[in-house]
């Protein structure tokens, strides 16, 4: 059963890492849509490089978690907290276009559960 959980983590974790890496890249490039979404929830532009770094670190940690379980668990916890914070940021300004952040938070929780079970 552990091997099935590991394979499931490998798929979910890798796909989540790819999404995080793409998002980090777009954030660092100052993509208009990303910047507009961040401004909509009142995130200062000066925070964008730090938030991109957090997403990139999460991506690296999820992939490293394929070889070192504690890194995968830590990364999944961090990514979950990041996207829970994103959901809270949307709710704080009464912006209910929060499905992407909520879905990514749930995927991060799934990665955490799978890596813990593997």
What is the predicted function of each stretch?
Residues 2-118:
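Membrane-interface extramembranous regions
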């Amino acid at each position: 059963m552990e091997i099935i959980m590991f394979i499931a983590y490998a798929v979910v974790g890798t796909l989540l890492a790819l999404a995080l890496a793409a998002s980090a890249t777009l954030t660092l490039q100052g993509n208009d849509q990303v910047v507009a979404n961040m401004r909509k929830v009142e995130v200062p532009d000066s925070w964008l490089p730090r938030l991109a770094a957090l997403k990139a670190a999460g991506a690296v940690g999820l992939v490293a978690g394929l070889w070192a379980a504690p890194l995968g668990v830590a990364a999944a916890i961090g990514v979950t907290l990041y996207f829970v914070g994103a959901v809270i940021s949307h709710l704080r300004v009464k912006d209910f276009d929060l499905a992407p952040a909520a879905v990514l938070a749930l995927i991060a929780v799934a990665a955490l559960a799978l890596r813990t079970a593997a």
